[in-house]
Regions:
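Juxtamembrane "helix-exit" motif on the non-cytosolic side of transmembrane helices
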Residues: 21-36, 65-66, 91-106, 130-132
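Histidine-centered active-site microenvironments of extracellular/periplasmic hydrolases
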Residues: 167-171, 428, 432-471, 522-524
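Substrate-binding rim/cap in mid-to-C-terminal beta-strand-loop elements of soluble/periplasmic
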Residues: 215, 446, 450-499, 514-516
Length: 528
């Protein structure tokens, strides 16, 4: 195997690894990026790129050379162009996807990186042409490869990632609310469930939500990150401010002193972008912005939070509902029907049954709180989302799935009835899902046609609209308004509780859900 081939392949791999380091640094502006860590990371990512990209390229070049031998073949310019072109596209995609997850300066530098890699493509073309024309010797070719490796190094050293810490908001009092609050996080709820699946008279409580509640679709921020969306709902801020992005973090102590909160998007997952298996997956850092329930608790309102997704640290309001099946009040005929309906799906039976038991335990805990002195109850239910994800009937012949979903809808309707029946008069009830679920798109279907893809029936990966429903005094029954955003939920609840809206909240009050008389009698108040 020729030395030139080794230089071309491994040099290109090192360039790809260094570009990956730049992208990881850009995605985590809140992490202290000391020069020592950056410099330590350079050889790590360069060698990782040689292994993960350079070695496959070397094998490919060797095979190509065997079938198409040529003495003067020099592949470095074409390979470098390919790396920088992919980097430009990938950086641009991440800049578009994570616009709301990064601070303004960090996002701006990420956009500039996309342009910089485009310029690097032109540099590779020009430099390669000059070497071929005026000095096509081994020394000049090695110098070209060194220059390509140096481009991402120069980029990260001359244009460091702007440091930006997340917004810090402690649980300060907001005042005394005018009424009690029950907010039900119903994961997987969307207009399809409410208007089509729940159209039957068999679901009286879902019918009540549809006919007596005011509703707005919720357009989730992209990309789909479950914890980020639920945290935005509770805090009224976007992930770039509250700091919760993924449901996991990564520690790479050799390079970073803090936990990485976000990895860049790549077509088939980005876990392998961290070098040499030196990283450790850990729970993400907690939200830096206090959720609305914490501010109500600081105002003296007794609070109960059951199962709300996110990273909340040691929040004393959080309760863990016991999922002991013996203590779960699941009516025996419903239990038997669900067990029979799950029999044809052994691969997901245990997972879905655990979710059913867990949700029922959460309902029991929430009902106990509602019947007591607790004035602020938050509960999250996950069974509907899990059942729809793997067993949504999407073809006429999916009769077993259809029967199973009907039972899940019956169970959900009973749980809603139990929760609504435990609320006192004048209680403000909110039902929210910050995202919906949709069947696989054309790309996923194409992957499945060729034997790839996944086995889910519906997914939130495409960021379909969720739903926000309100019940109570001051709500215009049956009203439908334009789509809201996840951060709009918290300020809307503040306003309807007679509390001031915090100025730091990115969302706004969804006034279309409120009656004109309530708007006239309750002027909007804003506090820091």
């Amino acid at each position: 195997m020729k030395l030139r081939m080794w230089v071309d392949a491994l040099g290109t791999g090192a360039t790809a690894g260094l570009v990956a380091e730049v992208l990881v640094l850009r995605m985590n502006p809140e992490v202290t990026q000391a020069m020592r860590g950056v410099l330590v990371g350079l050889p790590l990512w360069a060698s990782w790129g040689m292994l993960m990209a350079g070695v496959p390229l070397l094998i490919g070049l060797a095979i190509f050379e065997r079938f198409r031998p040529r003495e003067d073949r020099w592949s470095a310019p074409a390979l470098s162009m390919m790396v920088f072109l992919i980097a430009a596209v990938l950086t641009g995609v991440n800049a578009k996807l994570y616009a709301l997850l990064l601070s303004g300066p960090a996002h701006r530098v990420l956009v500039q990186d996309s342009v910089a890699w485009g310029v690097a493509v032109l540099v590779a073309v020009a430099a390669g042409s000059l070497v071929r024309r005026f000095g096509n010797s081994r020394g000049w070719q090695v110098a070209f490869s060194i220059m390509m490796v140096a481009l991402p190094v120069v980029r990260i050293l001359t244009v460091p990632t702007p440091q930006r810490q997340h917004l810090e908001v402690t649980a300060q009092p907001l005042g005394e609310p005018e009424r009690r609050l029950l907010i039900i996080g119903l994961e997987g709820l969307d207009t399809k469930v409410l208007l089509v699946d729940a159209a039957s008279a068999s679901y009286p409580n879902l019918t009540r939500l549809r006919e007596q509640g005011a509703r707005a679709p919720i357009t989730p921020h992209r990309p789909y990150l479950r914890w980020a969306l639920w945290t935005s709902t509770a805090t009224g801020t976007y992930p770039g401010r509250h700091g919760v992005k993924d449901h996991r973090g990564w520690d790479l102590p050799l390079v970073f002193s803090e936990t990485l909160r976000l990895l860049p998007w790549t077509p088939e997952g980005s876990r392998m972008i961290l070098p040499w298996g030196l990283s450790k997956q850990v729970p993400p850092p907690p939200a830096t912005v206090a959720p609305l329930w914490a501010r109500l608790d600081a105002s003296g309102v007794s609070t109960c939070v059951v199962g709300w997704p996110g990273s909340w640290g040691d929040d004393p309001s959080l309760q863990t509902a016991s999922s002991d099946e013996v203590g779960t009040a699941l009516e025996w005929t419903m239990r038997a029907s669900l067990e029979a309906a799950l029999e044809p799906f052994p691969e997901r039976r245990s997972q879905i049954w655990s979710a059913i038991v867990q949700d029922q335990a959460r309902v029991e805990a929430a009902v106990d709180a509602l019947k007591g002195p607790v004035g602020n109850v938050w509960i999250n239910l996950e069974t509907l989302s899990l059942a729809r994800r793997y067993h949504e009937p999407i073809r006429p012949r999916d009769t077993r799935e259809r029967r199973f979903l009907e039972l899940i809808m019956e169970l959900l309707d009973e749980q809603l009835g139990t929760l609504l029946g435990a609320t006192a008069d004048q209680t403000l009830v909110a039902v929210v899902s910050p995202f919906g679920l949709t069947p696989p798109g054309s790309f996923e279907r194409l992957k499945r046609f060729f034997g790839g893809g996944e086995s889910w029936h519906t997914s939130a990966e495409g960021s379909p609209d969720g739903l926000f429903i309100l019940l109570g005094n001051g709500i215009d029954p049956g009203r439908r308004v334009q789509p809201a955003r996840p951060p709009d939920v918290a300020p809307t609840l503040c306003y309807l509780l007679g509390l001031p809206v915090a100025q730091y909240m990115d969302g706004s009050v969804v006034v279309g859900l409120v009656t004109p008389s309530f708007l006239e009698e309750h002027p909007l108040r804003v506090v820091d």
